[in-house]
Curated annotation (Swiss-Prot):
Transmembrane segments: none annotated. Belongs to the AtsA family. GO terms for cellular component: chloroplast. InterPro entries: RibonucZ/Hydroxyglut_hydro (IPR036866). It comes from Porphyra purpurea. This is Uncharacterized protein ycf56.
Amino acid sequence: MEIILFDNKINSRFNKVTSTNYAAKLDQTSEIWLFNCIENTQHIFLKSQLKLSQITKIFISGTSFKYAAGLPGLLSSLTLSGKINTVSIYGPNSLKAYLQACTKYSQTNFSFSVNFHAVSYGKLVSGQSYTVICLPLSSNKLLYGFTILKKQQQGVFNLKKAITLNISQGPIYGELKGKHNFLSPDGYYLHGEDFSSSTTLGNKISIPVVLKYSRIISEMHWLSSYTVKSNTYPHQQATKYLLSNIETNVMNYQVSQDNNLIE
């Protein structure tokens, strides 16, 4: 899986911080999952090598307008591009009413179906390869974080080798794929590990959001396979613009210290 960070900078003109926006490009399929939808997201796609038509899921992490400011425009752009496949949107309950109002007053009809799913603590998406878990990041449940779990992939059975050794097709193929060993009637030793490729271990990817340090942030990053690159700012610069709503180098240090204690 490839995670692409869309630019998020301190806006010194308006004294605010834009929300964090990521696109996740899946390995085995051509799908793109979008985490938050800032303004002009469709223009960012046009400047990159990503394709709008490959977006299948959109995750919105908060009720604030900045997390979904570009969502109506993005959906309209998908319609103009001729998209017909269903798009699933995961977000707070108020987001559904917001989208319905946007389509009503702008008299916009989408060329594809939109499935809305209200986010809550627990498992949001469960597929063959990936699982997405939602965690509330505030006590009032107005802000959420997402963790992607990539499942362990079993090795591929080497059918060509089995045919070469004249092994008849049947339940023994499954046993060999399961790394079991056998001794054939003619005395030939069949080593299960030789008949399948290595198992690919799963991993954990936590999608960070712009937020002040908290214990739940540390738990999200605990045992993560790797940290998603995000823009961090010096503590003094951050507090100058927004006191408690930005990721700083101090916060990163606190998260790493917590993880060391847990381990």
